[in-house]
């Protein structure tokens, strides 16, 4: 079994999988020594597409719902006439089970596993807020954050300071 540990925002995540997972260059600076993680993500592959309940929140290709103490996140891609393409995560406390459709077995990456697990939701449950930002540090030592979606000019604005 492959096991990789990564540390983000003071939280160590262990990713475990029976199949190889590609390391992501974007995640490389956060790679951590194997140790006791605060959260474990276990990846497996299966083409059994979960059926969200009618009460699930649905936006585009994403469904979210709670079932008791479990948080569910389903992202479905593709069309019904092709093999299933989806990621599905169930989080119970400090453990997340992630299922990728078999179509993703080749090329599954650390970054894709973290995103499928709903890492931002995991942080939110710990009282942490994640912002997509560019930043500068002023001469006085103050930080200025430019937050917003990709492509709106955060880095461009930061470069003008």
What are these regions (language model features)?
Residues 1-145, 160:
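A noncatalytic interaction/capping subdomain that flanks phosphate/NTP-handling catalytic cores
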């Amino acid at each position: 079994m492959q096991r990789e540990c990564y540390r983000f925002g003071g939280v160590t995540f262990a990713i475990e999988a029976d199949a190889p997972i590609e390391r992501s260059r974007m995640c490389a600076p956060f790679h951590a020594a194997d140790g006791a993680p605060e959260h474990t993500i276990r990846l497996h592959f299966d083409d059994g597409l979960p059926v969200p309940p009618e009460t699930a929140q649905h936006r585009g290709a994403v469904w979210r719902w709670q079932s008791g103490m479990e948080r569910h996140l389903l992202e479905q891609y593709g069309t019904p006439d092709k093999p299933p393409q989806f990621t599905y995560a169930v989080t119970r406390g400090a453990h997340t089970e992630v299922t990728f459709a078999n179509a993703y077995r080749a090329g599954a990456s650390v970054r894709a596993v973290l995103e499928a697990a709903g890492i931002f939701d995991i942080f939110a449950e710990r009282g942490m807020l994640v912002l997509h930002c560019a930043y500068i540090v002023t001469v006085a030592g103050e930080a200025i954050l430019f937050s917003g979606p990709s492509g709106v000019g955060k880095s461009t604005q930061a470069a003008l300071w």
